[in-house]
Swiss-Prot record:
UniProt GO molecular function: GTP binding; GTPase activity
Chief location: Golgi
Protein name: ADP-ribosylation factor 2
UniProt record similarity statement: Belongs to the small GTPase superfamily. Arf family.
UniProt KW NAD keyword: no
Binding residue positions for GTP: 24-31, 67-71, 126-129
UniProt-listed CDD domains: Arf1_5_like
PROSITE patterns to which the protein is assigned, alphabetical: ARF
Recorded superkingdom: Eukaryota
Lipid linkage positions (N-myristoyl glycine): 2
Encoding gene (name): Arf2
Organism: Mus musculus (Mouse)
Amino acid sequence: MGNVFEKLFKSLFGKKEMRILMVGLDAAGKTTILYKLKLGEIVTTIPTIGFNVETVEYKNISFTVWDVGGQDKIRPLWRHYFQNTQGLIFVVDSNDRERVNEAREELTRMLAEDELRDAVLLVFVNKQDLPNAMNAAEITDKLGLHSLRQRNWYIQATCATSGDGLYEGLDWLSNQLKNQK
């Protein structure tokens, strides 16, 4: 009987954990986002070869965020990070019109993976501070997000350097985690 109360108490008050995989094409802003969330400041980044991993505490949830390099030569390695991923953050450079179709292809390929079938999808439309940036509606269309009928997804306009939109995205992720059984 005590076990029932312990489980109830943990579900109501215990810290939840969520494993997040953050991917996207190179130079989309993934590492800048990770360290803005972790440290609250802008860090000087270099292209990620391999990965960065940090734990971000937010609203009683411990997000373990894996930031995986996005250069085309290392994208085949993304699949090694899929296992046990509950949330996928796909970062798009909203100013990079030439590569938005490439981003769509990579996202489509990933979402077809069986290991990610239950992962929720958060798309960060990054670099909204730039004058020619595509807005969230335009990116939704270009990525074909409306065709994702079997997946819970959300799109959020962001600016990694100022932090705009990042916590709104984490709010959505935390609500998804709370709604999971």
